[in-house]
């Protein structure tokens, strides 16, 4: 930029030729300053974009216990764990407990006979109604899982309501057993990105299933056995869905455990099947360990 006072003083003492040179140099300098300002602005914008991109990338990772890094984001979508990639012939059997307890003790007795431990996902209402059953499940060595307080469609709730649904039953189970649950299964298998992220932010691994026994349809014991044992998805790392309180589940359980054993599978709780750290997911919700 050329200041008028400077120009007047120079014009009085300097020949026209030099005056034109001076003005030209001043214009070049001013132009350089303008370009530099634009570049600085451009670099600032790029820097902000880079930071935002980095934050977005970090957003696709979740930290468990503030120590390890895991990825639950696949193609921009947050996924719960449907199954696990493993070379070991292990599967997890899970029971959802939301209504009734007529068959709870029978299920526990059959599991004990087979020396098998499983995972029970319990609603807050079920915990309140059957506290002795919760204690019996825990004392028998089974996983205690969170199935929400009121069995609502979690994707339709606000973040605050999601947290209340999780933490209300969390505190009830903790008070009864001392256990801080870490496994969460959304009611009806209903989830979206917000449900998965909310669960993780509250210290939970969101869990689905890849083998549905369809015991809730009440088709009979043979139907349950055929559905599970001949399911196309059944394999190493599968998570099997059953229900406490379904009409034929307890009747089918003994034969189901025998059938899984005959296929060479060891039944374990979900907590012993999933990876707690250093893993990522594929598009099917399969949990895959990171390469070492």
Tell what function each PLM region has.
Residues 92-94, 118-122, 143-146, 182-186, ...:
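Structural recognition of the beta-strand scaffold that forms the well-ordered cores
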Residues 1-93, 109-118, 236-292:
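Terminal accessory/targeting
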Residues 134-136, 160-162, 222-225, 282-286:
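Short low-complexity, flexible loop/linker segments enriched in glycine and/or proline
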């Amino acid at each position: 930029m050329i200041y008028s006072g400077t120009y007047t003083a120079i014009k009085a003492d300097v020949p026209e030729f030099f005056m034109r040179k001076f003005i030209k140099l001043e214009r070049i300098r001013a132009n350089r300053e303008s370009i530099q300002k634009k570049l600085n602005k451009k670099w600032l914008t790029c820097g902000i974009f880079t930071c935002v991109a980095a934050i977005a990338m970090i957003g696709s990772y979740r930290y468990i216990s503030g120590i390890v890094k895991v990825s639950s984001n696949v193609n921009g979508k947050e996924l719960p764990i449907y199954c696990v990639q493993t070379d070991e012939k292990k599967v997890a059997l899970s029971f959802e407990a939301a209504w009734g307890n007529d068959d709870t003790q029978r299920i526990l007795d059959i599991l004990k006979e087979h020396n098998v431990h499983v995972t029970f996902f319990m609603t807050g209402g079920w915990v309140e109604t059957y506290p002795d059953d919760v204690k019996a499940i825990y004392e028998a060595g089974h996983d205690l899982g969170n199935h929400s307080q009121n069995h609502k469609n979690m994707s339709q709730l606000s973040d605050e309501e999601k947290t209340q649904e999780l933490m209300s039953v969390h505190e009830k189970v903790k008070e009864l057993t001392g256990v801080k649950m870490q496994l969460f299964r959304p009611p009806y298998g209903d989830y979206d990105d917000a449900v998965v992220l909310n669960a993780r932010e509250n210290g939970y691994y969101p869990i689905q299933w890849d083998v549905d026994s369809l015991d809730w349809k009440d088709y009979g014991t043979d139907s349950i056995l055929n559905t599970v044992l001949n399911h196309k998805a059944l394999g190493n790392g599968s998570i099997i869905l059953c229900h406490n309180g379904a009409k034929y589940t307890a009747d089918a359980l003994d034969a189901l455990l025998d059938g899984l054993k005959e296929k060479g599978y060891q039944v374990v709780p979900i907590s012993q099947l999933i990876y707690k750290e250093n893993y990522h997911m594929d598009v099917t919700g399969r949990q895959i360990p990171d390469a070492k």
